[in-house]
């Protein structure tokens, strides 16, 4: 007899969703911790958001500025996952983010992303 498996993140559903950011928002835990590091928010002082509402506000702000986001690659295994997210600005600039995720019951409880921006 095998032990029941815990739900994991459905990366393929995120990757193929017409609006990846909406699909991603649906799998954020209420107590999610979202950490991003890039050239402006360097490792000693990363950008940190606490809670689902704070992350949703950040996503809404990006969308209000015409930024589109797509999950372009990733995998999940048990309570861990990794995603590649590509964001595009209306003017053609792009941001690439690779993130490691901690999961609980298939929802994201911790996001640690490293971003690279077009100059």
Indicate where each model-derived feature is located:
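A beta-strand edge to alpha-helix "cap/lid" segment located at domain peripheries
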Residues: 2-3, 57-119
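A solvent-exposed, acidic/Ser-Thr-rich amphipathic alpha-helical stretch
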Residues: 22, 27-72
């Amino acid at each position: 007899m095998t032990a029941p498996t815990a739900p994991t993140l459905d990366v393929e559903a995120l990757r193929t969703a017409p609006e990846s950011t909406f699909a991603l928002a649906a799998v954020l835990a209420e107590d999610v911790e979202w950490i991003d590091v890039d050239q402006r928010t360097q490792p000693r002082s990363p950008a940190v958001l606490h809670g689902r509402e704070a992350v949703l506000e950040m996503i809404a702000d990006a969308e209000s500025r015409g930024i589109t986001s797509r999950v372009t690659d990733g995998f999940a295994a048990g309570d861990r996952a990794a995603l590649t997210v590509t964001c595009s600005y209306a003017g053609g600039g792009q941001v690439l983010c690779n993130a490691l995720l901690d999961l609980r019951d298939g929802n994201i409880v911790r996001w640690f992303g490293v971003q690279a921006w077009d100059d």
